[in-house]
């Protein structure tokens, strides 16, 4: 996958998603000063560049999901740093709505709604990723700000929140990613990657804490296909989990080398094909292959083909 055929470049690649036509969408953080440069890039399933858009997220591009609603598909985008907003877009990049911090929650400094700046803290809004609820609406993780999970209806109206900063049993330290695990149809669960605690936390669909699953290396986000849960870990590997959240396989692991070698993130000459540096997001495509976006200086996307 390459954008060298276009006039654009990318920096730190953050998230990746696939639509029903197997087109690939990648968001990078970008640089705030490049105000006319896009944050979202679209490729065909062979990695050929198609188009780009989303300059409004430059310097803060982060979360990206494709969601089908009725007969249409939409992009949901979250942005942190100085942007501090989340949006619903068409697949061509037209904005349907954009929203800022939910002041109804009484969690945030009023500045987060009125005039966001690149300021961090537990009273700041730094949205990272989405999960979509089975009866409509969605959850939004404030993974770098207040550490809350917010619940919205299908129109983006804030309803409630749970979590916050704490010890890891219903509270978080960087709740970076999340997923609705509906592999048990009768009892869907919310799974949150509590990144700095190196765990997954499990909740019922109403947000009641159920369990903590340890043993990860900075888990960043989640995807699922069939009975397999996919967890990219910033600690240099991608894990596949069964219905009981037990590890089936770990792909591209380079944990020891990345931990013990300085500067790998910045030095492309130290990257190894098939080995990961810092997986920040991953998803299955329509063929069961896995796409991984990495938190490295010049961005990297890797495709792992399913063994058949």
Where are these regions (language model features)?
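Short loop/turn segments that connect beta-strands within the blades of beta-propeller domains
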Residues: 20, 36, 71, 82, ...
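Short loop/turn segments that connect beta-strands within beta-propeller blades
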Residues: 43-48, 90-94, 153-157, 204-208, ...
């Amino acid at each position: 996958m390459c954008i060298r055929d276009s006039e654009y470049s990318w920096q730190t690649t953050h998230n990746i998603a696939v639509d029903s036509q197997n087109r690939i969408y990648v968001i990078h953080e970008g640089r705030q000063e490049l105000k006319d440069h896009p944050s979202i890039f679209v490729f065909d399933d062979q990695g050929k560049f198609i188009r780009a858009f989303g300059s409004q997220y430059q310097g803060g591009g982060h979360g990206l999901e494709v969601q089908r609603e009725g007969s249409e598909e939409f992009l949901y985008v979250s942005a942190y740093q100085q942007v501090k907003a989340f949006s619903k877009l068409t697949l061509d990049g037209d904005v349907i709505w954009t929203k800022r911090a939910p002041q109804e929650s009484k969690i945030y400094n009023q500045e987060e709604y009125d005039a966001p700046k690149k300021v961090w803290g537990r009273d700041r809004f730094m949205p990272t990723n989405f999960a979509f609820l089975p009866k409509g609406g969605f959850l939004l993780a404030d993974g770098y700000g207040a550490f809350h999970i917010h619940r919205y209806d299908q129109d983006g109206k804030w309803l409630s929140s749970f979590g916050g900063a704490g010890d890891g049993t219903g509270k978080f330290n960087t709740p970076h990613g999340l997923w609705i695990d509906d592999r048990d149809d009768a009892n869907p669960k919310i799974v949150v990657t509590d990144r700095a605690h190196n765990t997954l936390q499990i909740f019922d669909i109403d947000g009641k804490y159920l369990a903590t699953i340890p043993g990860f290396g900075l888990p960043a986000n989640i995807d699922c296909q069939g009975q397999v849960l996919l967890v990219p870990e910033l600690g240099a590997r991608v894990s596949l989990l069964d219905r009981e959240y037990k590890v089936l396989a770990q792909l591209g692991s380079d944990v020891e080398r990345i931990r013990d070698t300085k500067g790998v993130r910045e030095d492309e000459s130290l990257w190894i094909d098939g080995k990961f540096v810092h997986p920040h997001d991953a998803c299955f495509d329509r063929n069961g292959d896995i796409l991984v976006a990495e938190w490295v200086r010049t961005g990297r996307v890797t495709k792992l083909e399913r063994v058949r």
